[in-house]
């Protein structure tokens, strides 16, 4: 077997908050993949870091009365503690606020600049006169310029789905101070992404670099046209200053998304320096130099919401600075809990440390593994199913094999297994299944791997049930058969531990002690324990108690109520502005009426939903393909994602406003608006029509 040299990363958690179960989907997925590849004999290095720059961190530190450096150090310590609880085994964990990251960020920038890929131009932005800083889109709210919905963020409307510039908002206000922002002009630095369009089109479709659905989504962005990427921010900002700026522009900083992916390189370089001169030494250039792209492998595991950065900006930056690009980028979906988005009020927005206080982390590792595939699909943590699956599969099937067999061997045979296997065909069958399991792990088809493993466990339990060693133990002269049956069962249990080791490292470590062995690598699955003595059996896993799950949910409600309570000093103005009741015109006052001729201008048609899907990179939008009775279906974006699963709206008849001017959005062209009712902050309901409504008919 050729030993592959592989570098693996997970997306960098932002140093501004706690790790929760939604984050852990990715880190558990990556850790399982890394452990499985190491178990198969490959040289795999797994690095990560905290994403430690940006305005949000600067403001959070200010709120907490500490320096940004203290803020990110405190958060990083908490992150590393949480990851350790869930057995995430990084080879190195670093920070983007590091000298290595500064060095590589400046190197990439200078190479891009010197080859003509960086330009500057003046940008008009909203500026908070009280805070004395330029406002990022998410720090501005106002009235949507398209549908007039109030309290919408500065980048897109949650009601109608329209994207816009923050300067287009009506009645804007700063979410930081409640002040009315003013317009100011500043020179910004741009990376010329369109210059790399052909390279990116080829790259995204070559060598299985991306999942098919991701490549298809990127094609939509190509069709809409790539735009230059703003890579600069103005002071005050926590991050790295852009080098070599003119003397009249001293306070320009790299935008956080420029140096964040560079953090992968920085963490790896930090590890290379730590290991220099040791037997485990690593050569940075061997993995990142352009000429070594086909000698080593680099894989990024990410969430589907940051595909745009990792599959467009990042490879273009690397190619433009003459560094190697990733071998592949693997995207995953989001976590739902009990079929819905994680909810603070329902106690299903569960922090990592809250979970670990009540339940064993390996329960979650197994459950996630049983749900994860190579697809970009959301997974659902159904708490009832979670309890049943763990108790049934791990306790009732796997651990039960050892517990029901070890007692006979320890009591009557001093823990000795037989010298000859009584059922070689059964063990050979389970050994052969290991090839399928190994392939499933490598292909990130973890749910398939878990199904195959449980099928092996079922065979073992069926064998034990058929042979009934508890009954044989009472039969005079059947001593050898009892030892034979239990020895076969223990050997199957050992094979299952080989297969489950990437998912359940703590369980398998305890199993090694019980089995009196040192090796559970994939290569060892061909080895049988013959004439071997096992140690005393201790319970390896406890059943999940429903009370513990309930306590975890209750604790999540309590802790998040405390964390989310706003302070009066910051939020009173905001609450006053946003919750004051609107004045109601008296009968003698003139309201803002429109004439019938104005309403008649709005064209609304019966539309049939023929396709509905999530929008990569947009956590509020759903994308619809609508038949409105025209020659071609229409593409429409709607900001209702948090209220619906796409499949809930398939084949429905809805109302579409069809004579709105097409709107160019980041994700494509929106050719209409779907009507909904309700409060966009709490619940929107799509207005649906009876089946007997005719597609394309006008509403009047």
Curated annotation (Swiss-Prot):
Entry GO CC: cytosol
Pfam hit, one: Anticodon_1
Cofactor: Zn(2+)
Cofactor note: Binds 1 zinc ion per subunit.
Assembly and binders: Homodimer.
Name of encoding gene: metG
Family: Belongs to the class-I aminoacyl-tRNA synthetase family. MetG type 1 subfamily.
Reactions catalysed, as given in the entry: tRNA(Met) + L-methionine + ATP = L-methionyl-tRNA(Met) + AMP + diphosphate
Residue window of motif 'HIGH' region: 13-23
Residue runs in coiled coils: none
Keyword Zinc: yes
Domain tRNA-binding: 598-700
The protein, known as: Methionine--tRNA ligase
Short sequence motif 'KMSKS' region: positions: 341-345
Higher taxonomy: Bacteria, Pseudomonadati, Pseudomonadota, Gammaproteobacteria, Moraxellales
Origin: domain of life: Bacteria
EC number: 6.1.1.10
Binding locations of ATP: 344
């Amino acid at each position: 077997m050729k030993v592959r040299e592989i570098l693996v990363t997970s997306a960098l958690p932002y140093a501004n908050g706690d790790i929760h179960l939604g984050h852990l989907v990715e880190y558990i997925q990556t850790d399982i993949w890394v452990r499985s590849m190491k178990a198969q004999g490959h040289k795999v290095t797994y690095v990560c870091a905290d994403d430690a720059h940006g305005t949000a961190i600067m403001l959070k530190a200010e709120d907490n009365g500490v320096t940004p450096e203290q803020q990110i150090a405190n958060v990083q310590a908490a992150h590393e503690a949480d990851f350790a609880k869930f057995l995430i085994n990084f080879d190195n964990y670093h920070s983007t606020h590091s000298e290595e990251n500064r060095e590589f960020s400046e190197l990439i920038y200078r190479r891009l600049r010197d080859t003509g890929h960086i330009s500057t131009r003046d940008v008009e932005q909203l500026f908070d006169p009280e805070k004395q800083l330029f406002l990022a889109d998410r720090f501005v709210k106002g009235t949507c310029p398209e549908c007039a919905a109030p309290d919408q963020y500065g980048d897109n409307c949650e009601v109608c789905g329209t994207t816009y510039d923050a300067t287009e908002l009506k009645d804007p206000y700063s979410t930081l101070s409640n002040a009315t922002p003013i317009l100011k002009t500043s020179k910004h630095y741009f990376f010329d992404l369109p210059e790399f369009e052909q390279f990116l089109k080829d790259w995204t479709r070559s060598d299985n670099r991306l999942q098919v659905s991701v490549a298809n989504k990127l094609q939509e962005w190509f069709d809409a046209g790539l735009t230059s990427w703003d890579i600069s921010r103005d002071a005050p900002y926590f991050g790295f200053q852009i080098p070599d700026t003119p003397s009249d522009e001293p306070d320009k900083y790299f935008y956080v998304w420029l140096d964040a992916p560079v953090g992968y390189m920085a963490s790896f370089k930090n590890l290379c320096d730590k290991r220099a001169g040791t037997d485990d030494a690593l050569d940075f250039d061997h993995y990142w130099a352009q000429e070594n792209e086909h000698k080593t492998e680099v894989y990024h595991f990410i969430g589907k919401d940051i595909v745009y950065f990792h599959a467009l900006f990042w490879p273009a930056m690397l190619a433009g600075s003459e560094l190697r690009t990733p071998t592949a980028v693997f995207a995953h979906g989001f976590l739902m809990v009990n079929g819905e988005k994680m909810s603070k009020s329902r106690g299903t927005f569960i922090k990592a440390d809250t979970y670990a206080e009540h339940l064993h982390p390996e329960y979650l590792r197994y459950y996630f593994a049983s749900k994860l595939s190579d697809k970009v699909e959301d997974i659902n943590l159904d708490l009832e199913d979670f309890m049943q699956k763990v108790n049934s599969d791990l306790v009732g099937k796997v651990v039960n094999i050892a517990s029901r067999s070890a007692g006979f061997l320890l009591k009557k045979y001093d823990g000795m297994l037989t010298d000859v296997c009584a059922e070689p065909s059964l063990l050979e069958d389970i050994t052969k299944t290991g090839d399928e399991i190994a392939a499933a792990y490598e292909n990130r088809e973890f749910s398939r791997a878990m199904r195959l493993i449980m099928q092996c466990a079922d065979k073992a339990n069926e064998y034990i049930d058929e042979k009934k060693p508890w009954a044989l133990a009472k039969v005079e002269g059947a001593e050898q058969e009892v030892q034979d049956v239990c020895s076969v069962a223990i050997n199957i249990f050992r094979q299952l531990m080989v297969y489950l080791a990437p998912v359940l490292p703590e369980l398998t470590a305890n199993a090694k002690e019980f089995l009196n062995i040192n090796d559970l690598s994939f290569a060892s699955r061909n080895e049988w324990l013959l004439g071997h003595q096992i140690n005393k059996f201790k319970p390896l896993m406890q059943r999940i108690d429903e009370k513990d799950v309930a306590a975890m949910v209750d604790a999540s409600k309590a802790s998040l109520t405390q964390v989310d309570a706003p302070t009066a000093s910051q939020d009173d103005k905001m609450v006053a502005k946003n919750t004051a009741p609107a004045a109601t015109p008296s009968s003698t006052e003139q309201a803002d009426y429109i004439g019938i001729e104005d309403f008649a201008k709005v064209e609304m048609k019966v539309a049939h939903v023929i396709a509905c899907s999530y929008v990569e990179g947009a956590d509020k939008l759903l994308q619809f393909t609508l038949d409105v009775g025209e020659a071609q279906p229409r593409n429409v974006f709607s900001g209702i994602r948090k209220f619906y699963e796409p499949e809930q709206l398939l084949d429905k008849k809805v109302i579409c406003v069809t004579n709105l001017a097409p709107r160019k959005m980041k994700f494509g062209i929106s050719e209409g608006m779907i009507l909904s009712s309700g409060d966009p902050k709490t619940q929107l309901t799509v207005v649906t029509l009876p089946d007997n409504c005719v597609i394309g008919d006008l509403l009047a």
